[in-house]
Regions:
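Iron-associated oxidoreductase/ferritin-like identity signal
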Residues: 1-156
Length: 156
């Protein structure tokens, strides 16, 4: 089915962000494991895999619309030098993703592409859940202090 190029561009923009986030979260998971924070490492690895599933669905939709998925383009990967900085950088990135997805949903509405709108809404819900998790973690760091928070992250 031939899709609107504007929609394909939106999908490729979201795909670029997802591909970047896969790598960012995978590297963060490995760093967290190296630092001994196994609980956070497991969470980040799972999130990396979730982002990969989003990318897969985006690629499938682009191909369905007879577009070409751009898997060569990536944004800058943002890695923190400590856990709190990583959480903050990830929250910043997820907030940008939520805005991008909301804008994409609106574009889909304007161009009457309900199938792509549904896909972007589903990814949006996942990203909003991750925003909530990151905000909670940063709140815990603030209330407990970094040392107590990190002590809770040592074991799965």
């Amino acid at each position: 089915m031939k899709g609107d190029q504007t929609i394909i561009d939106v999908l490729n923009d979201v795909l670029t962000a997802e591909l970047t986030t896969i790598n960012q979260y995978f590297l963060a998971a490995r760093m967290l494991k190296q630092w001994g924070f196994d609980r956070l490492a497991v969470y980040y690895r799972k999130e990396s895999i979730d982002e990969m599933k989003h990318a897969e669905r985006l690629i499938d939709r682009i191909l369905f619309l007879e577009g070409l998925p751009n898997v060569q383009r990536m944004n800058k990967i943002m890695i923190g030098e400590n856990v709190e900085e990583q959480l903050k950088l990830d929250l910043d990135g997820e907030l940008v993703a939520v805005k991008r997805l909301n804008d994409g949903v609106q574009t889909c509405r304007d161009l009457r592409d309900n199938g792509t709108e549904t896909l972007l809404r589903e990814i949006l819900v996942s990203e909003e859940e991750h925003v909530d998790w990151l905000e909670t973690q940063l709140d815990l760091v603030g209330r407990l202090g970094a040392t107590a928070y990190l002590a809770e992250q040592l074991k799965e």
